[in-house]
Amino acid sequence: MSMQTEQELVALCLALIKDQDSLSAAEKKLTKTTPVSALKPREIDTIRKRSRAGLTHSANVLFDPLGHRAPRAGAVYTPAPIVRSMMTWLAAQGSPARIVDPGAGSGRFILAAGEAFPDAQLVAVEMDPLAALMLRANLSARGWTDRATVMVKDYREVKLPPCAGITAFIGNPPYVRHHDIGEDWKAWYASNFAGYGIKASALAGLHLHFFLQTRLLAKAGDVGAFITSAEWMDVNYGSALRRLLLDELGGIALHVLEPTVEAFPGTATTAAIACFRVGETARPVRVRFIDELTNLNGLTKGTDIPREQLQAASRWSIIVRPSAPAMAGDIELGELFRVHRGQVTGANGIWIAGEHAQGLPDRVKMPAVTKAKDLIQAGAHLNSAEVLRRVIDLPTDLDDFTKEERRRISSFLSWAKLHGADQSYIAQHRRAWWSVGLKAPAPILCTYMARRPPQFTLNACDARHINIAHGLYPREPLAAGIMASLVTWLNKNINTGSGRTYAGGLTKFEPKEIERLRIPSLENLHA
């Protein structure tokens, strides 16, 4: 039986929940206009029994009759084999007196924990009132209302009473990017990290906030395992979490799941399961790269890495998944090239020329690569700038223009100011707000964010580029034939494994990651 509307789902939840006095104000608001469930008592009893059974006939799918609606923003349901492996790991750490799921949804983790630890108190935190109703219904169907507490609030606001035994934290914190996090919470994040002597970036996503809040709530000896997207292992804003795991949260294991494992179905992203025991600062961290669900093995296997090695590493992915052994004579691309991201305009709609720029002198409208597609379609050689758009690149000093040119430029700048071009963060930090400052043409250009390996392209037409591409600039002059051979080699041999895979399956290569790519020596390349 399927619920066709949200009201039907709410009605079913209410039919399953015995103690409705405990509902939060947000949940009660959802129920005000909900009619009595049209399901017959026998049908409701069937749902209750199936929910209590916990699993369907498929060994790989949790039976969660109230959890297959579209999840809340930032939430993606975790496949059952991963949930079970995390529970197996947790069981090996002892018997927790309390289990906390910080982003419980309809209860996938907390229900599995309730089965695995029948004597533990359950604490489920969930902001979405509909998901919280589904969670309560699932708990009620299992008869666990007395041992469970559901908090309908932001996990960062949660306070936990003292607990005599071990508290275990487990779950899949929601993925919300920093753009959607308020300034007050960003300040909270930085301030609390500073309390541990750690500098934290405001670019961190919500899942990193959840790790921090867990440390604030936990005491020595508490344990946990969270599965999140894995980008924090490498990016600059993840450095605070990396330190927290080693120095404060007691990280003891890190299992990284290839996108093909689909830890977050439909997202094709790399996932990481971080396991911790608060207070642990000496033992090695067990790390492993997993390319199939069948290799999870209860999160027991892996290679033990000294904490000092992780502390010294600027990126953890190269430790979890070391690069292939270097061939004799191989070098890093960065020995030959400096790699620079393209210029940020601050307002592409204004600075990429269109009808609004028709009156400007041609000499300030530079042919430029403005889309990754420009390079992908060009392939190994960008021979002509005819197909490229133009970027308006005015100098800081406008005195060299003729009187007529100045008049047209002034008219354009008045229009640009009217549209807020001078108010962007980028514009306000330029020497002159109107001067984009495009970099010199790079002999080789490459894409850096796509669901495919980077496209390396010889820039035969001296096009400029904005920040959708990287430019490769030789440290010393190189012959055209050598650069052509290098581009051919890079396009044949570089894959997405050298970058970082984000939610949505996008693989990103930062400039330093391009510089670290291993390539044949010039002698071998041109042989």
Curated annotation (Swiss-Prot):
Gene designation: xamIM
PANTHER family linked to this entry: DNA METHYLASE (MODIFICATION METHYLASE) (METHYLTRANSFERASE)-RELATED (PTHR33841:SF5), DNA METHYLTRANSFERASE YEEA-RELATED (PTHR33841)
EC number(s) reported in the record: 2.1.1.72
Matching InterPro entries: MethylTrfase_TaqI-like_dom, N4_N6_ade-DNA_methylase, SAM-dependent_MTases_sf
Record keywords, A-Z: DNA-binding, Methyltransferase, Restriction system, S-adenosyl-L-methionine, Transferase
Disulfides per UniProt: none
Segments forming a coiled coil: none
Keyword Transcription regulation: no
GO molecular function terms attached to this record: DNA binding; site-specific DNA-methyltransferase (adenine-specific) activity
Similarity comment: family membership: Belongs to the N(4)/N(6)-methyltransferase family.
SUPFAM superfamilies in alphabetical order: S-adenosyl-L-methionine-dependent methyltransferases
Top-level enzyme category: transferase
Catalytic activity: a 2'-deoxyadenosine in DNA + S-adenosyl-L-methionine = an N(6)-methyl-2'-deoxyadenosine in DNA + S-adenosyl-L-homocysteine + H(+)
Gene Ontology biological process terms in this record: DNA restriction-modification system; methylation
Protein name listed in UniProt: Type II methyltransferase M.XamI
Keyword Transferase attributed: yes
Domain of life: Bacteria
